[in-house]
């Protein structure tokens, strides 16, 4: 199991939003590259980056900064936000991003999404962002009217390599994860699932860990909690390693 430290980029700085609202932001760092290095030094095995400007505008905005982050790290980076065509995807992968997270076009343009998965096999994942059981698109401001169960078979058939599942109601709220919804998805999925939204404490990590042993849950993204100190990344990763080591004995 992996805890993915998150960097959300807006106007060139690291921010966290509450429930994805652009008007409810907290700036945590004015130096995203230094922040990325910090999370690597704290034991991060992956870095989760979101270009919020890109998500809201529908096109890449922070590409030079994202390249600088990739260049500064030895760990892989997964990126989402504003990736809505093959040219953008190719540019980010060539810039050093290991895998890409697609949201809007996966739901609104299924043929284009399937083509992306075919062109970059194993490197394209989908972001399923749910509020009240319905999936959102366009930076969480548009309602698709679809549910996870309705889209999952098509996404898997298209060649999705991994899934990020966000409970928007819990994102940035530090209220714990939606375990029933997450377990349902992780059991139904044939590819790795990563939880996002609500991971606030080590107890939340401990609650998720059993699912990583019995389902396709790969890990969880943590943002506000690791910035505000309610979850210590190194402590969480050490705890996970101890559990995995004990099970291997």
From Swiss-Prot:
| A Pfam family it matches | His_biosynth
Q: Catalytic positions?
A: 8 (proton acceptor), 129 (proton donor)
Q: What keywords is this UniProt entry annotated with?
A: Amino-acid biosynthesis, Cytoplasm, Histidine biosynthesis, Isomerase
Q: What is its EC number?
A: 5.3.1.16
Which GO molecular function annotations are given, in alphabetical order?
1-(5-phosphoribosyl)-5-[(5-phosphoribosylamino)methylideneamino]imidazole-4-carboxamide isomerase activity
Which GO annotations describe the biological process of this protein?
L-histidine biosynthetic process; L-tryptophan biosynthetic process
What range does the record give for the signal peptide? Answer: none
Its pathway? Answer: Amino-acid biosynthesis; L-histidine biosynthesis; L-histidine from 5-phospho-alpha-D-ribose 1-diphosphate: step 4/9
Catalytic reactions on record: 1-(5-phospho-beta-D-ribosyl)-5-[(5-phospho-beta-D-ribosylamino)methylideneamino]imidazole-4-carboxamide = 5-[(5-phospho-1-deoxy-D-ribulos-1-ylimino)methylamino]-1-(5-phospho-beta-D-ribosyl)imidazole-4-carboxamide
Q: Kindly state one GO CC term assigned in the UniProt record.
A: cytoplasm
Answer yes or no on keyword Transmembrane helix.
no
Q: Where in the cell is it found?
A: Cytoplasm
Listed NCBIfam families = 1-(5-phosphoribosyl)-5-[(5-phosphoribosylamino)methylideneamino]imidazole-4-carboxamide isomerase
State the family it belongs to.
Answer: Belongs to the HisA/HisF family.
Q: What is the name of this protein? A: 1-(5-phosphoribosyl)-5-[(5-phosphoribosylamino)methylideneamino] imidazole-4-carboxamide isomerase
User: What organism does the record attribute this protein to?
Assistant: Nitratidesulfovibrio vulgaris (strain ATCC 29579 / DSM 644 / CCUG 34227 / NCIMB 8303 / VKM B-1760 / Hildenborough) (Desulfovibrio vulgaris)
Q: What does the record give as the organism's lineage?
A: Bacteria, Pseudomonadati, Thermodesulfobacteriota, Desulfovibrionia, Desulfovibrionales
């Amino acid at each position: 199991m992996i805890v993915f430290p998150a960097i959300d980029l807006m106007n060139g700085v690291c921010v966290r939003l509450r429930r994805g609202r652009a008007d409810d932001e907290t700036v945590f760092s004015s130096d995203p590259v230094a922040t990325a290095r910090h999370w690597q030094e704290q034991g991060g095995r992956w870095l989760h980056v979101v270009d919020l400007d890109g998500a809201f505008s529908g096109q890449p905005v922070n590409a030079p900064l994202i390249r600088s982050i990739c260049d500064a790290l030895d760990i892989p980076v997964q990126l989402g936000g504003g990736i809505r065509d093959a040219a953008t995807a190719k540019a980010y992968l060539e810039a050093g991003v290991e895998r890409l997270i697609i949201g809007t076009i996966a739901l609104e343009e299924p043929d284009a999404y399937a083509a992306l998965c075919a062109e970059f096999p194993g490197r394209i994942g989908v972001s399923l962002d749910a509020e009240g059981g319905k999936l959102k698109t366009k930076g969480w401001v548009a309602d698709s009217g679809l549910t996870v169960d309705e889209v999952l078979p098509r996404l898997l058939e298209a060649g999705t390599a991994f899934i990020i599942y966000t409970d928007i109601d819990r994102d940035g709220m530090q209220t714990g994860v939606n375990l029933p919804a997450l377990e349902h998805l992780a059991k139904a999925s044939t590819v790795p699932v990563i939880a996002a939204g609500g991971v606030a404490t080590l107890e939340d990590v401990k609650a998720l860990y059993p699912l990583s042993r019995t389902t396709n849950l790969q890990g969880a993204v943590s943002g506000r909690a690791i910035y505000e100190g309610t979850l210590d990344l190194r402590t969480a990763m050490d705890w996970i390693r101890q559990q995995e080591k004990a099970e291997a004995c």
